[in-house]
Amino acid sequence: MSVDTQKVIEDNKRSAQDTGSPEVQVALLTARIELLTGHFKTHKKDHHSRRGLLQMVNRRRSLLDYLKKKDGERYKSLIEKLGLRR
């Protein structure tokens, strides 16, 4: 059980060579966060991994704030695409 990095990049890239845009970074973090969330359903006392999860959530929040400040339309489309902010 791991994140299919290439598929996530393909689905969210802005150009042919894009691997580091905020959209791609947020999508990769979201995929890893969802994977870890499932892990915690069975391993409730895994506090070391929970710390890593919180760091990923904070990093994603920072990237989303940056994207919202720079380009609101890209932010809105990414939120819809990933299903965040219900």
From Swiss-Prot:
Q: Which GO terms describe its molecular function?
A: rRNA binding; structural constituent of ribosome
| GO term, biological process aspect, one | translation
Q: Show the SMART domains listed in the entry.
A: Ribosomal_S15 (SM01387)
Recorded hits in CDD domains, A to Z, give: Ribosomal_S15p_S13e
Q: Which GO terms describe its cellular component?
A: cytosolic small ribosomal subunit
Region of interest: Disordered? 1-22
Q: Where is the composition biased (Basic and acidic residues)?
A: 7-16
Which keywords, in A-to-Z order, does the entry hold? Ribonucleoprotein, Ribosomal protein, RNA-binding, rRNA-binding
Name the InterPro entries for this protein.
Answer: Ribosomal_uS15, Ribosomal_uS15_bac-type, uS15_NS1_RNA-bd_sf
Q: How does it assemble?
A: Part of the 30S ribosomal subunit. Forms a bridge to the 50S subunit in the 70S ribosome, contacting the 23S rRNA.
Q: Its biological function? A: One of the primary rRNA binding proteins, it binds directly to 16S rRNA where it helps nucleate assembly of the platform of the 30S subunit by binding and bridging several RNA helices of the 16S rRNA.
Please give the family membership noted in the entry: Belongs to the universal ribosomal protein uS15 family.
The protein here is known as Small ribosomal subunit protein uS15
